[in-house]
């Protein structure tokens, strides 16, 4: 499902990730463990295409994240440590916006958004502005956007 080969990320003279290689199989759960500054979030950001690697490759379901980003990203749902939420949108507006970004077909959008919102128990918050939600509800909105479209892989960075 995911293959990482000789992944490197350098920021000037600092090497954040140094020749990392691994494979992630479908249907299994994996985790990165390490101290602060070990490169866990940087690795996840490279896997998801948020930042480019200095060297190495990331392939998701046969698609290189840099050469075929749209195809690769269709396979991934990503919840970064700080979810990219728009505070001046309601929960429902935001979820519809994400559905459009993910190119969810119009005939499935309404039902899929409703289903995902119910899964993470935010349906009652759908008309509230995101800026007025508690941190816990904001995290749920972030999780909902990650699983919208039912991607094959969900990547969670500091999901608690």
Residue ranges, per PLM feature:
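Walker A (P-loop) phosphate-binding loop of ABC-type ATPase nucleotide-binding domains
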Residues: 35-39
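Conserved ABC transporter NBD signature motif
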Residues: 56-67, 71-72, 76
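Conserved ABC ATPase "signature" region
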Residues: 96, 100, 107-125
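Conserved ABC ATPase signature
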Residues: 129-133
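Conserved catalytic motifs of ABC-family nucleotide-binding domains
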Residues: 150
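Catalytic Walker B motif of ABC-type/P-loop ATPase nucleotide-binding domains
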Residues: 154-157
């Amino acid at each position: 499902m995911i293959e990482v080969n000789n992944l490197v990320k350098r920021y000037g003279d600092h090497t954040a990730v140094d020749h990392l290689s691994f494979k992630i199989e479908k249907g299994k759960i994996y985790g990165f463990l390490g101290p602060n500054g070990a490169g866990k979030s940087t690795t996840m950001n490279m896997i998801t295409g948020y930042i480019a690697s200095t060297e190495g490759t990331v392939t998701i379901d046969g698609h290189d994240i840099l050469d075929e980003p749209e195809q690769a990203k269709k396979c991934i749902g990503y919840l970064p440590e700080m979810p990219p939420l728009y505070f001046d949108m309601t929960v429902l507006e935001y979820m519809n916006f994400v559905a459009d970004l993910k190119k969810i077909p119009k005939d499935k959008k309404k039902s899929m958004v409703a289903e995902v919102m119910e899964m993470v128990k935010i349906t009652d918050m759908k008309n509230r502005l995101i800026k007025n939600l508690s941190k816990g509800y904001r995290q749920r909105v972030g999780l909902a956007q990650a699983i919208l479209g039912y991607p094959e892989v969900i990547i969670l960075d500091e999901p608690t």
